């Protein structure tokens, strides 16, 4: 599944303004081997760049739909464009995430979070959002299957305990 063209243009606009982004969410899931439908485009962005990123999105015709740990945008004129979520993380977290060597796009120029970070984000989402449970658990299971040997079982257990709690490992792997 190919990333929509407007996502490439958006990434380039951010690059021109020296605001780094990392592709996350469903498109990162697809990049890491599990192709599935996604109804938005998630980017990780440093909180240090939040004000500039919001101003850039507004200058490109996007309106804020809601703000929390992420800011969701919709284009004010082109309603067929997918919503865009900017997920805000600390400067330190962004620096760690940006060490990923994963790239996507026709010119392989779009930075993507690495598999371990993606799993950590999916596990963290499980902790607080029951309505997301099914989708995120499936993502984790399929990502582990598609990337056998990349993340060890012990490392997955550690990630589960750290980001989703002590029972998450059994839940994710359907262990009674």
Model-identified regions with their sequence ranges:
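Compositionally biased terminal segments of proteins
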Residues: 1-176
């Amino acid at each position: 599944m190919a990333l929509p063209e407007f996502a490439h243009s958006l990434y380039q606009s951010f690059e021109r303004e020296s605001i780094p982004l990392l592709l996350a969410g469903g498109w990162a899931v697809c990049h890491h081997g599990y192709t599935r439908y996604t109804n938005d485009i998630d980017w990780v962005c440093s909180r240090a760049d939040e004000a500039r990123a919001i101003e850039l999105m507004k200058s490109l015709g996007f309106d804020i739909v809601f703000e929390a740990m992420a800011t969701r945008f919709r284009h004010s004129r082109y309603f067929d464009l997918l919503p865009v979520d900017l997920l805000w993380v600390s400067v330190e977290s962004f620096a760690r995430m940006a060490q990923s060597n994963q790239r996507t796009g026709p010119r392989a120029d779009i930075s993507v979070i690495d598999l371990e970070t993606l799993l950590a984000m999916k596990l963290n989402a499980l902790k607080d959002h029951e309505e997301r449970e099914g989708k995120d658990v499936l993502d984790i299971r399929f990502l582990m299957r598609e990337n056998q040997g990349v993340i060890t079982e012990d490392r997955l257990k550690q990630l589960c305990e750290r980001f989703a709690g002590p029972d998450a490992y059994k839940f994710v792997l359907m262990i009674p």
